[in-house]
Amino acid sequence: MMKLNIKNETSRLRAVILGTAESPGPTPEYENAYDPKSAEHIKAGTYPLEEDIVKEMEAVREVLEKYDVQVFRPNLVKDLNQIFTRDIAFVIDDKFIKANILPDREEEIEAIQYVIDQIDPNKVIELPEDVHVEGGDVMLYNDHLFIGAYYGEDYPQFITARTNLNGVEHIRKMFPNKKVHSFNLRKSNTEARDNALHLDCCFQPVGKGKAILYKDGFLDEKEYEWLVNFFGKENIFEITQQEMYDMNSNVFSISEDVVISERNFTRLNTWLRENGMTVEEVPYAEIAKQEGLLRCSTLPLIRD
């Protein structure tokens, strides 16, 4: 049996499920896009090609293996986008929680069933139907849990709203020992620059007590300010709207000292290095066109 352990975003990583970019299927129809950024690229004819995204994901696999991380990959399902494993499930402490994802993504969970089979079945949690939480909205910080959500009555109208208040409450009940903080995120079905698809599109802790943050991803300025006070202004790297659009907050930590980042994130990578971190740069700009980056395409199972 695999003993899961995830308590934060930065402890030394030992095992992870990395998505796969092979056989993602034809470019989706414009009206079938799940998010505004993919739609933008479908329309412009710049939607990523399979060979490019396969190369990008291989670069990440190489970095993970260089640090002796055990890397699981989903079983290949032909013509299915299986890049973003973070959406389909997530781990809190020693629990593996399956997300209630869009129905046509069920096959993605089946493709990692061989991994789930290695986990104690009592630790594998299925959520009730009206409880929506995706891994990109769940950020762990030891005793604290940060959860991105959308509070509006019009939640069902937003294909970009992936976590609801039922989701926040359900997690709160499941983990009574954690301090759960929720954040109301800005959503747009049509304009990627005004859309925080998940919490990790506008916030992520890195290193020792530092964080990357994008102010306008939060609908309530008080919630944004709470985060600033929690980490301390001097420990925060504020990103611009363009950097948010390019997915700067969606890097992925192997440890407090090692971060995998996109090679074009010049300003962020400089800041990470100035703060004592080793930055492993990879090309990920094609995958970013689907409104997801490094954190979105990883599902950590075990950290120290």
List the model feature ranges, each with a label:
Residues 1-304:
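The feature marks the mature, well-folded catalytic cores of soluble enzymes
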